[in-house]
């Protein structure tokens, strides 16, 4: 996991957590300059999501623990707010439930599509519909790549399947 930092380190901390398969820059590049004027902005790039690290996303709990440990070490265990988009919202919920850090505000964002341009959202929506339809209808993804990834995970973590 990598955390990117913006703004004054002594300012109130806002933690930004991106959505599934989203790069932190694509989710937050437009708001970071605005937030960094008055806040210390931390953007999390999960294991397996960052081009600067050779890592693999394992579990939500493992990643949540890493985020909490970072907040304890770098922020004294206290942040003003955490905003999570999609998958990031799940992390915000887990951190609130676990109570290992103090978070003044937790904001759960919606779908990643709500941050995209109309054209990009339309294209992503159509791609997702085609994948999800075949999964629901046939019980398999139409993409051989996705099927191979799922099969690899089944072998690696049979307790989840």
Where are these regions (language model features)?
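Conserved HGGG/HGGXW glycine-rich cap/lid loop of the alpha/beta-hydrolase fold
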Residues: 2-53
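Structural signature of beta-strand start/N-cap positions in the alpha/beta core
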Residues: 13, 40, 79-81, 105
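Active-site loop/oxyanion-hole signature of alpha/beta-hydrolase fold enzymes
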Residues: 42-81
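Short beta-strand immediately N-terminal to the catalytic nucleophile in serine-hydrolase-like folds
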Residues: 82-84, 109
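Gly/Ala-rich beta-loop-alpha elbow adjacent to hydrolase catalytic centers
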Residues: 84-92
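Flexible "cap/lid" loop of the alpha/beta hydrolase fold
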Residues: 93-97, 103-135
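Conserved alpha/beta-hydrolase catalytic His-Asp/Glu region
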Residues: 116-123, 133-161
């Amino acid at each position: 996991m990598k955390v990117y930092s913006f703004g004054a380190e002594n300012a109130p901390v806002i933690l930004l957590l991106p959505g599934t398969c989203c790069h932190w820059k694509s989710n937050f590049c437009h708001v970071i300059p605005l937030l960094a004027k008055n806040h210390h902005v931390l953007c999390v790039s999960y294991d397996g999501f960052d081009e600067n690290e050779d890592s693999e996303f394992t579990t939500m709990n493992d990643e949540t623990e890493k985020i909490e440990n970072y907040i304890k070490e770098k922020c004294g265990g206290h942040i003003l707010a955490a905003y999570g988009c999609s998958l990031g919202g799940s992390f915000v919920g887990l951190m609130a439930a676990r109570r290992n850090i103090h978070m003044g505000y937790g904001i759960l964002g919606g779908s990643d599509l709500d941050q995209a341009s109309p054209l990009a959202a339309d294209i992503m929506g159509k791609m997702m519909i085609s994948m999800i339809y075949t999964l629901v209808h046939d019980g398999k993804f139409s993409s051989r790549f996705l099927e191979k990834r799922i099969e690899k995970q089944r072998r690696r973590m049979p307790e989840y399947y």
